[in-house]
Amino acid sequence: MPTPALTRYSMQNLSVDQYLRAHIRTVPDWPAPGVQFRDITPLLQDAKVFRVLIDAFIHRYMDPSIRPDVVAGLDARGFILGAVVAYELNVGFVPIRKKGKLPFTTVEETYELEYGSATVELHTDAVKPGDRVLLIDDLIATGGTMMAGMKLLEKLGAQVIEGAAIVDLPELGGSDKLRASGLALFTLLDFSGH
């Protein structure tokens, strides 16, 4: 059953999927020629659209069988989504940051990029062993960042119950790689092309 906001703001008889998709801007040839960049900022700029977006996640994670104890957000747009989702679910939020941004003792995980590597970190006291964690980001492309986030949480004994994102770019193979690793995924929209 849709939440009141989902019903109220599903305008012009559009489904939630269609409504959200209509508010994602595609920027051709950015950041490089041939890339179709999926810009989520229009989803955040309009309060009604942002509410529909957040309600789509909340509607899923209110289910007791998949309700998290903690939400972890990936640097940086995962912070925007994760903090609001955690607030709405009345659970804690923990940021997974790029290396060198957290002031306390951390664990780290390095992952490969198309041209190099990157490292993300998490405070060692961010989660407790056995915590059920929802790992959230804006988009899944190659899956490297989400995979690194999952490994960090597991190093601390947490159970990642699901990875979530607004957009999946299935042609880049990240969602397949994440599912093959055993991570359950929930994405609101799939976009072909990248």
UniProtKB/Swiss-Prot annotation:
Reaction equations catalysed: AMP + diphosphate = 5-phospho-alpha-D-ribose 1-diphosphate + adenine
Key words, A-Z: Cytoplasm, Glycosyltransferase, Purine salvage, Transferase
Domain of life assignment: Bacteria
Pathway annotation from the record: Purine metabolism; AMP biosynthesis via salvage pathway; AMP from adenine: step 1/1
Pfam family, one: Pribosyltran
Transmembrane regions: none
Predominant location: cytoplasm
EC number: 2.4.2.7
Single Gene Ontology MF annotation: adenine binding
InterPro entries: Ade_phspho_trans (IPR005764), PRibTrfase_dom (IPR000836), PRTase-like (IPR029057), UPRTase/APRTase (IPR050054)
Top-level class of the enzyme under EC nomenclature: transferase
PROSITE patterns, sorted: PUR_PYR_PR_TRANSFER (PS00103)
A GO CC term assigned to this protein in UniProt: cytoplasm
Places the protein is found: Cytoplasm
Gene3D superfamilies reported for this sequence: 3.40.50.2020
One of the GO biological process terms: adenine salvage
Purpose: Catalyzes a salvage reaction resulting in the formation of AMP, that is energically less costly than de novo synthesis.
Subunit architecture: Homodimer.
Family: Belongs to the purine/pyrimidine phosphoribosyltransferase family.
NCBIfam families, alphabetized: apt (TIGR01090), PRK02304.1-3 (NF002634), PRK02304.1-5 (NF002636)
Identification of the protein by name: Adenine phosphoribosyltransferase
Gene transcribed to yield this protein: apt
